[in-house]
């Protein structure tokens, strides 16, 4: 039981270890962050139009797992919030499942998740709902009833219509119109502010008409909705009651006041109209307007009509929001200042996206920029001759745009790539090699500026034209790596051999090519430096029999020293300018019947067929005795002539000597020939006798017998050679032993044949001569026929090898031996030393050398 528990515990620890290791090695998946402009990634900062239909695939979640495991995607929302999206867990495709309304919710927070088998990563991202023109202007104070005193002056504002469009941009701007001028001939409305006033020259008459009904139309600026341009409007009815005037402080009509300055406005434009009336409806007083504070000189107001006018250009305004205090003062008919009232008019400076990006040069707007520069500038260098500025006069996001350069290849790059309002444009070199004068002498690029976040996507283009100047960046190049030429021998000096051509794509002086030749075979040739024509030296004499092959190098070089090489092979073609010449030694021949004789002629021409010779017999008497081999020159008897008897039967000549006229003719064109007289003495072979002769004659019929005999002789010679070599080797080994001291015993000379001597001193009895028997190459022993032969000397051991083994130094000859050698050399022909003494000296020298050898080993 205890062992079972221990086994279970060990298994548990092992499983825990594997889980721990597996957990350590498993990494969590992650999303790709491709930025807000991408359609795949983690949905961060995704912009989605509110008019996107349900069921649209709006995005693709995209991520990966470091271990390569499959991942699943998910989308969740805050508890209780509406779920707008659904995601496919495997593909990551996100689908819109609910309608969007930016006015209700302009930002949706989403929890996107990515998970593998063990880990899950959740990220909170925001999806921004972009506006579409789907909202109508909504009146804030309509329909309404307005009381207007009948003594209200013409041009006075009587009401401010307010309508709000919850859309943004141009779709959220509101302009006002009266539906029909016939229904309200006495009134006019400001299109931007919505202020309704009495038309100039018109007045109200309480007695004639106490009520006026006006239909006001509010229209937005239009925008994109479901892919189409759409303008939306609303209408409402304003009822104007004309009342009699009464005595009361002024009352501003239509407060609060909001006015807008658009960038298209100019000085003098009416920005807003304030309107105040006297509270005394039955007997109202005159009201005058003034600006109390907050205008900063940028605005002015008409004191009677209340019209606020712009004094500056919108670009010169220092602020985006102005809060202006307007004062309305009652003036009595006598001109006395009475009661007054103040109100605040808020004026905002509104930017419209009505300016596309514009490129500027040094002298103003410009859409073509030209530059002249050398080819192959350094990579990373900016084009200094281009002074380009780009500007968008709009504000905020309306002035944000991208820069892009379009042209051949990726030679240039523009910096910066994203601009807000204004930037200096810099163009950098990215691919210097592509900017090649030889490929194109000018380059044209399009510089594009395209707005990013605006519906209009205004853009601008400018042409950049670069004129390239040539540099010496190319070496001359031959049309071929080698040239093969043939020229006949005996061509006169100055003859053209071959023309070489090298091209340098550079222009002007850089494209000028000069030619030269060099090399061991160029001695007899010249080249025209400008044309590349190779010709022979004026003194050159070409002879194919002397030299038929030449090769050398030709060099093409531009003015800066850039060059290339080509090899020229010149073959001197042979002309048939030598006739055949007979060998004088072959003109007298003795012919044995059955064996041919050969004559030979030599043609000194260098090439075939000029040096190929054909032999023929031109004349022979009689002409039916000889045949000649046309190729080899072998002359032989006719096959039927097999004995001297047949020869003598053919001719009356008893001396058997013929003179044959033979012609040697070459095969050149034109052909040369030479004739000569060949004297042929015909004889018959002497028959051989004996068994050996009989054997050889029989072997002619059976050559294998002859080959067997030759093989046997060779084997016997090899065997004898091995035996002799073995005997010599054994004798040398015995002679190399150290022998005891010897005494020379003088003996009387005995008559003995010279061949019985067993030492190297030999004496020829027929011819007196001296033999060099000094095995150490230092002592010469001379012997003559007179005086008489010396007695037998002791047998000398064989000499030491004349060369030491590899790696051993030679032993020097002892002094005694050297002294004897010196003396003996001086008397090479007169030797007075006794042969016995000479033998003793040689033995002494040998012992000394053997002793030295023993000491060394």
From Swiss-Prot:
Extracellular side: 26-709
Bias-annotated ranges (Basic and acidic residues): 752-765
First and last residue of the signal peptide: 1-25
A molecular function (GO) term: calcium ion binding
Gene Ontology biological-process entries: cell adhesion; homophilic cell adhesion via plasma membrane adhesion molecules; retina layer formation
GO cellular component, one term: plasma membrane
InterPro entries per the UniProt record, alphabetical: Cadherin-like_dom, Cadherin-like_sf, Cadherin_CS
Subcellular location: Membrane
Calcium recorded as keyword: yes
Ranges that cross the membrane: 710-730
Gene null: resulting phenotype: Irregularly shaped Muller glia cells and disorganized retinal cell layers.
Main location: membrane
Chain spans, region Disordered: 746-765
Cytoplasmic side: 731-857
Sorted UniProt keywords: Calcium, Cell adhesion, Membrane, Receptor, Repeat, Signal, Transmembrane, Transmembrane helix
Tissue specificity statement from the Swiss-Prot or TrEMBL entry: Expressed in photoreceptor cells of the outer nuclear layer of the retina and in the pinal gland.
SUPFAM superfamilies the UniProt entry points to: Cadherin-like (SSF49313)
Protein purpose: Potential calcium-dependent cell-adhesion protein. Plays a role in the organization of retinal cell layers and Muller glia morphology.
Name of the protein in question: Cadherin-related family member 1a
Native source species: Danio rerio (Zebrafish)
Lineage, top ranks: Eukaryota, Metazoa, Chordata, Craniata, Vertebrata
